[in-house]
């Protein structure tokens, strides 16, 4: 598992407006953590394209990602999950999409570089 990979994950149970259920997630944790930690940091992905209106929303192309339809990574919906929640590998985002994801994480966390 590497940063930029997409998996289906079981995100239930949830509270309030959290994204839940069996859904695609984007691995955003660094590869050292991915190798040694029992947990992984992910961002929820939705296929509701109308959601791509915030600076923390990044469009993901279905052609490159392996997703069944074009989708949106929700970088305000980042959470740490146990690796056992990851189910099926889907694919990867492109390098240019991952660069946009990294910028959206900076926006989400208020990091200025």
Regions found by a protein language model. Name each.
Residues 1-113:
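Conserved functional hotspots at enzyme active or ligand-binding sites that engage polyanionic ligands
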């Amino acid at each position: 598992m590497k940063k930029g990979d997409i998996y289906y994950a079981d995100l239930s149970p949830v509270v309030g407006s959290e994204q839940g259920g069996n859904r695609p997630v984007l691995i955003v944790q660094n590869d050292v953590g991915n190798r040694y930690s029992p947990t992984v940091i992910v961002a929820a992905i939705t296929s509701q394209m109308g959601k791509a209106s915030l600076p923390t929303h990044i469009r993901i192309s279905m052609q490159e990602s392996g997703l069944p339809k074009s989708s949106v990574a929700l970088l305000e919906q980042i959470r740490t999950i146990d690796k056992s929640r990851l189910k099926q590998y889907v694919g990867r985002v492109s390098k240019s999409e991952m660069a946009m994801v990294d910028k959206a994480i900076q926006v989400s966390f208020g990091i200025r570089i």
